[in-house]
Amino acid sequence: MYKTVSVIGGDLRQLTLAKMLSQEGYLVSVYGFGKDSLSENYNAEKDIQKAVCADVIILPVPVTLDSKKLNAPFHEETIALKELSDIIKKDSLVLGGRISKEVYDLFEGYKIIDYYKREELMIKNAVPTAEGAIEIAMGETPVTISDSRCLVVGYGRIGKVLSRLLQGLGADVYVSARKYSDLAWADVWGYRAIHNDEIKDCIQKQDVIFNTVPALILDEDILKRINPDSVIIDLASKPGGVDFQKAKDLGLKVIWALSLPGKCAPITSGKIIKETITNILKEEG
């Protein structure tokens, strides 16, 4: 049974997570947040040696940006991952988001779980991602979403939520996908369903194009057909789904909008992480 939790590094998402876990009865400490960590809900630890003395160690998302230092933007000093891995108890459960191979190697011998790979988190994160994408579209286009033609490329978690929200705002929603089963669902929900091979035939009349597929879909052939007044918003993780250099050469407006949950809705994102970690703790016993 896990009782003590230490949240080390991160941003407002992790502070939200710490507060919520405390409210559920866990004894929570935080480290690596500076003055932003003051709260009656948890203990703001100043000594990293004491901070790591917990049943559960929760690291940020991503754990690191360079495979050497912990991602701790609020902390005045560098927290070396090697130092951290050396002082955490071997019997602690270590949780982190978007854990790289280098981090897994450092924590060899530990029970370490990537909470950002959990399906429930990815599904719920689709909502702040979709809302953030629409917010960007509203700020980058001179027209309303209502009555706009919007193409959503890909009908996975984000594509499903995004299409529904756009439809609710009155957009004329086109959905492209590779699988015919996805196209069938898109048709059932009242969208204009097109196969990825047919994107080039409808791309010119789109006002906003949202890509959710992390593979090259919007290549040179398709980009040449896009209206110069359109906006392309790429929500896919690296390498993205747009030929960015060709789009730049053509003078197209492309926004690669990564990590929207943490930027647009950090408190909601923190709540989603908390719910996911609570599920993990129940499973791990």
PLM feature segments, named:
Residues S6-L15, L21, S146-L166:
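Glycine-rich adenosine-cofactor-binding loop
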Residues D11, G34, S100, R178-K179, ...:
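Residues in the short beta-alpha loop(s) of Rossmann-like NAD(P)-binding domains
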Residues L59-D147, A257, T276:
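Glycine/serine-rich phosphate-binding loop and adjoining beta1-alpha1 elements at the start
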Residues P62-D66, I79-D91, A186-P261:
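Rossmann-like adenosine-cofactor binding region
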Residues R98-I113, A236-N279:
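Rossmann-fold NAD(P)-binding glycine/threonine-rich loop
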